[in-house]
Structure formats: C-alpha cells, structure tokens
Amino acid sequence: MRQESGRSMIEMLGVLAIMGVITVGAIGMISTAMRTQKRSAVNDDVIQIVTGVRQLLGEFDDYSHINNATIFGAIGMNAKNPYGGTYELNVDPANSRQFIVSINGLSECDCKYFVTKAWSDSIGYQRSNGADGGATGSCTDGNGRNTVYITYGE
C-alpha cells in the first residue's frame, strides 16, 4: 500500500473559510480605525481654525472681516477636510460677533456624528433629532453632500 501525503480538498476549503472570516474581521477593524482617525482629524482642525480666528481677529469688535483665504493662509492650514470636502468660515448673519465654521462633504453617518458632538466653546447646544450637540446641520442629503455648522463667538 502506498503512503500518500498532502491535503484533501475538504481541508483546503476549511483553511480558506477560516482565512475569509479573519479577513472580513480585519477589514471591519481597519474601517473603524480609519473612521475614528478622520473624526479626530476634523476635531483637531476645527480647534486649530477657531484658535486661529480668535488670535487673528480677537482685537476687532466683530468677525465681519473674516476671509477664508487669509485665515487659512495665516494659520498655515489647507481648507480641505479629511472627507474630501472643505472647511469654510463665515460671519453669523444674525450676530457679527459670532462666526460659523462649516464642515462640507460629509456622509450622512459622519454628519450625524458631528451634529450631536459636544463642540467645546461653541455657542450653546442645538437640539437636533432628539440629541444635544453644539452644531447644526441637515444630514439628509446623499453621501458626501452634507454640511455641519458650528457657531463660535460671544
């Protein structure tokens, strides 16, 4: 009788199935890590933008002199956010002593996250879909077309 060596087809399919399960789990973990990293980057960017605006325009009585190109150039920052959209600065039309940081180009999920996030130093908390947050925004547009507005100032 001959001695055969090697693996059977069943054993190979079992190994491939196990590898598939491991791969799916790894992809899920990587996706979560990337989403968390992008959200942290946006938080850090907004803090840098707000600090820059306050340092550059703090001597004025209002923020009516806000200019996106000047502000982003002075703080050495690109207006592009990690989601492929942009950051924008505008004076609050209802109160020139306040300015609004806009985060454009968000998915519905990320928009909802940023609307309900408690933004430090933002003006009040806005009620949005039953959740308290320091920002406003409609998160019903298609992916990549949602915008969040965060108001800062007095």
Please tell me what each predicted stretch does.
Residues I30-A33, N43-S64:
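N-terminal alpha-helical signal peptides/signal-anchor transmembrane segments
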